């Protein structure tokens, strides 16, 4: 499985993410064991990290945060998300496609 995968039907991008909460800033770190490592500032408490991740990705891809689907890993650091019809693809992610 790839860290970033372009999906045709429905059109979008599937991300396999290793999430690092409690970071000093929000950023895409790079690849980590065939997953995209993303660091966020939120604490992993009561879904705050997931909400912050969705907000961060919605800004990067220029899509509404409600459209991003958390497919797997709600309570884990290893997550799988689907971003439907992104308006913009960040250069760090474009390089992995």
Swiss-Prot record:
One of its GO terms (cellular component) is cytoplasm. It comes from Actinobacillus pleuropneumoniae serotype 5b (strain L20). This is UPF0235 protein APL_1380. Pfam families: DUF167. SMART domains: DUF167. It comes from the Bacteria. Belongs to the UPF0235 family.
């Amino acid at each position: 499985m790839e860290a970033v995968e372009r999906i045709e039907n429905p059109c979008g991008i599937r991300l396999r993410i290793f999430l690092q909460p409690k970071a000093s800033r929000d950023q895409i770190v790079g690849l980590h064991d065939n997953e995209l490592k993303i660091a966020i500032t939120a604490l992993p408490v009561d879904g705050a990290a997931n909400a912050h991740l969705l907000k961060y990705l919605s800004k990067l891809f220029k899509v509404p945060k409600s459209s991003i689907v958390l497919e797997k890993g709600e309570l884990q650091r290893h997550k799988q998300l689907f971003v439907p019809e992104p308006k913009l693809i960040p250069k760090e992610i474009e390089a992995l496609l």
